[in-house]
Amino acid sequence: MIGHGDHTVAGPWSFSVSAGGLNVMRGPNGCGKSTFARTLLNLIPAISGKVRWNIQPHCRWVPQQLPLTEDYPVSVFDIVELGLWDTPDTGSPLWGLRPGKSQDKPAKQIVSEMLTRVGLNGMENRRFARLSGGEQRRALIARALVADANCIVLDEPMNGVDQEGRESLGKLVTDLAENSEILFLVITHDSSWIPVQPRCYLDLSATGEISLEPRS
């Protein structure tokens, strides 16, 4: 079961998801999707039960937004480079560089190549907070990718993104998921922007019940 303190939000559940590919958890606002994401990432403890992995997990979370004002002097490069070095003080083994992981390229080259991969080439020196919503998500995805994550959780990635941005960002996410071994888990209340059939849908009801719909 998941929740906050002694307050249960949803569960109990029992389900499994294969490594790699695009997986989507969908459900109405307030049903526990973000709480599930934080529990999966070990940012908050489960009330009961355990999350079990059959791989060594190295997860990154792409939040809905970073609380930065437009005059905050942090560049796109700075945000993405953090993926190489930062280890949030959560006590979680899912964050930071993999044990023994070393970089065989300069950080500047790694970041530049990843920005090109997500469609932000030439934007290294732009202030992150002045990017559009879709561009910010791309930068945060790049930060997850430079960290060599094998699990990327995107929390409502289309919030604050216009229609044109939704289409291009949706294509980026699905292309990355289908052409890598990374498990992408998208948390959303609206899956209409996803241009392909995901590996599976995890449907969460308003009452906290979950159903699994694998790709046929």
What are these regions (language model features)?
Residues 41:
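Helix-to-loop junction immediately C-terminal to a conserved catalytic motif
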Residues 148:
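Conserved catalytic motifs of ABC-family nucleotide-binding domains
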Residues 152-156:
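Catalytic Walker B motif of ABC-type/P-loop ATPase nucleotide-binding domains
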